[in-house]
């Protein structure tokens, strides 16, 4: 059976030493998250993930969710009790504003908790994750009465939330949606249409489900400019907050999926359901993007989380599985064979996964900290810089962390040989569960196009130039340190590749957009590698300083070796991405469609 141990030590290293979040005590909520409080929260979060959620992961995969004749849906055995424990423990509202019943702690902390839960049970974690994304949209764009009516119950886990975008004929292109909204005399709307692929659309974990639904008001402009956002509760809410009549929204069926079987992915039918406008008419994408950006960062964490749990299991197997002898002579002469972890190619594979996991985790903490600054700082300049960072890094994180997270799940499965293909080992579930993260909340090809088409040129390239300057400044400050050269020199080379690629796109994509389209995925992966290199250089600097001050520890020594492995064996791929980008789109676009 699979195992999982939350990486508390690594998270503490990032929070306390690399990013020193105590320096942000001036931000609301940070002074409440002292080192002792963080340690206690992470410890309890680890216990919850390891002892409650992880044992249910296999159960959820085998049982799945069941739809009944009346349209109701039941979740796998144990999910309801676990969700109650999560809700009553305040885990859903860890970073939600105190005015709505949350604890108001930093997002930086709640994202670490999110990783633990996603590793332990990705399908289960989605029920709460989507709920908090919906609350974020309501808090930013909802009317005061909507916030009062819905958000506290959602933060408490008494009600959950969803987002309803996709329809059979429209996925990425939401301008094609057909769900309609008809305004009523009392100011409400009647919503009619069908939505598909709705995660947590119907279940038995909470007494009400609050759906955020994109629809088109009668007479609205065509395309994306005519889309509005509505809040549509499963059960109507009376003026005093009590539950009233059942609304006209039902689960038509549950999708039969490759993975995340423990999450109820539904076809939702809206048959004149009562809903209320969120924000302004025809500006629904503004509200939905709040939720989608939250979701994209959450999905990025899913990529990391599945890579982490797959890695832990692959390492455990590699230590125990006896097969063959070391190329340099027997390492376990008293046994019939050596454990496979002695073999260089096995170590290469495991280090490849580990080096990604630790850099990706640093990137998540770094970006979560920027999110806290963007939403909590009183300094307009700091908020703008943090918001720039969020806009730039969101597509990179969503695309790269989920692409590599899936690849790493496959690599970890490979460590098991034929046993990894057998369901009882649990590795094939990690592969199946990780796959969806590359698709939903904006397929990764769309993330790449968003990066090169919108985020790169935005505000005259202000965000990307700020990133370049930050990395270059770090390299200049530490390049002369002999101990840092194995980290700084490769990082600087990779940064040069990214800068060359950026210049090429600026010179060749404006007049020929297909050049940008053909280069987009390589550019996104290149950007991710450079960001990982920067994270590794920062972690290496802190590790070296701690060793100089207090001596080496196994954790710090391992950190430095893993970082060097990344620089030597993974970062050189930036030159390949650059070469592909600079070839342009000629061969990509040359063939007629019929030739494929």
Where are these predicted regions, by residue range?
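C-terminal amphipathic alpha-helical interaction region
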Residues: 100, 458, 474-596
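Alpha-helix capping/hinge segments and adjacent helical runs
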Residues: 2-5, 10, 90, 183, ...
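A glycine-rich, basic-preceded beta-loop-alpha segment at the flavin cofactor/substrate interface
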Residues: 197-199, 236-252, 257, 264-295, ...
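Amphipathic, small/basic residue-rich leader segments at the start of a protein or domain
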Residues: 1-125, 149, 372, 580, ...
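Internal maturation/activation junctions in enzymes
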Residues: 79, 130-131, 142-184, 368-387, ...
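A structural-propensity feature for long, helix-poor, extended segments
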Residues: 132-134, 143-146, 150, 440-443, ...
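A short core secondary-structure module
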Residues: 188, 192-246
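Glycine-rich cofactor-pocket loops
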Residues: 29-32, 62-75, 287-298, 312-354, ...
């Amino acid at each position: 059976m699979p195992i999982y141990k939350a990486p508390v030590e690594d998270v503490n290293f990032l929070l306390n030493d690399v990013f020193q979040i105590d320096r942000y005590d001036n931000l609301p909520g940070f002074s409440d998250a002292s080192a002792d409080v963080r340690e206690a929260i992470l410890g309890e979060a680890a216990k919850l993930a390891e002892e409650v959620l992880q044992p249910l992961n296999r159960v959820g995969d085998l049982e799945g969710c069941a739809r009944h004749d009346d349209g109701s849906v039941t979740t796998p055995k144990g999910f309801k009790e676990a969700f109650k424990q999560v809700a009553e423990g305040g885990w859903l509202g860890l970073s939600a504003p105190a005015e709505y019943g949350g604890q108001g702690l930093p997002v930086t902390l709640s994202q670490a908790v999110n990783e633990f839960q996603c590793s332990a049970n990705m399908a289960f974690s989605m029920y709460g994750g989507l709920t908090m994304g919906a609350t974020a949209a309501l808090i930013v764009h909802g009317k005061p009465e909507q916030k009062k009516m819905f958000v506290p119950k959602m933060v408490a886990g008494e009600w959950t939330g969803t987002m309803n975008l996709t329809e059979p004929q429209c996925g990425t292109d939401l301008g094609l949606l057909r769900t309609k909204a008809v305004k009523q005399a009392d100011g409400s709307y009647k919503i009619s249409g069908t939505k598909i692929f709705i995660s947590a659309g119907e279940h038995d974990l909470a007494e009400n489900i609050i759906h955020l639904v994109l629809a088109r008001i009668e007479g609205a402009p065509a395309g994306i400019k005519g889309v509005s956002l509505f809040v549509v509760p499963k059960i109507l809410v009376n003026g005093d907050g009590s539950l009233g009549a059942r609304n006209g929204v039902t689960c038509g069926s549950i999708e039969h999926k490759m993975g995340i079987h423990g999450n109820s992915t539904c076809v939702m039918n809206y048959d004149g359901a009562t809903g209320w406008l969120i924000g302004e008419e025809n500006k629904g994408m503004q509200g939905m993007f709040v939720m989608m950006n939250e979701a994209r960062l959450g999905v990025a964490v899913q990529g990391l989380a599945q890579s982490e749990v797959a890695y832990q299991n692959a390492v455990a197997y590699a230590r125990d599985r006896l097969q063959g002898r070391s190329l340099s002579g027997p390492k376990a002469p008293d046994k019939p064979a050596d454990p496979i972890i002695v073999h260089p190619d096995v170590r290469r594979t495991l280090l490849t996964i580990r080096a990604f996991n630790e850099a990706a985790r640093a990137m998540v903490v770094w970006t979560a900290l920027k999110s806290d600054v963007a939403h909590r700082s009183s300094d307009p300049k700091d908020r703008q810089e943090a918001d720039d960072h969020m806009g730039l890094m969101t597509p990179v994180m969503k695309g790269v962390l989920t692409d590599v997270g899936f690849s790493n799940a496959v690599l970890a499965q490979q460590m098991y040989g034929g046993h990894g293909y057998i369901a009882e080992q649990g590795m094939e579930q990690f592969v199946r569960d990780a796959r969806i993260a590359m698709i939903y909340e904006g397929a990764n090809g769309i993330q790449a196009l968003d990066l090169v088409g919108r985020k790169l040129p935005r505000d005259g390239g202000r965000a990307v130039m700020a990133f370049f300057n930050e990395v270059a400044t770090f390299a200049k400050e530490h390049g002369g340190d002999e101990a840092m050269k194995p980290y700084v020199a490769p990082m600087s080379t990779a940064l040069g590749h990214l800068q060359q690629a950026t210049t090429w796109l600026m010179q060749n994509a404006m007049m020929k957009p297909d050049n940008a389209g053909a280069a987009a995925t390589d550019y996104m992966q290149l950007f991710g590698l450079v960001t990982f290199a920067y994270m590794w250089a920062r972690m290496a600097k802190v590790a070296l300083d701690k060793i100089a001050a207090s001596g080496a520890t196994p954790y710090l020594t391992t950190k430095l070796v893993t970082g060097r492995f990344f620089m030597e064996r993974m970062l050189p791929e930036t030159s390949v991405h650059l070469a592909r980008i600079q070839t342009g789109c000629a061969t990509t676009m040359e063939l007629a469609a019929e030739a494929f």
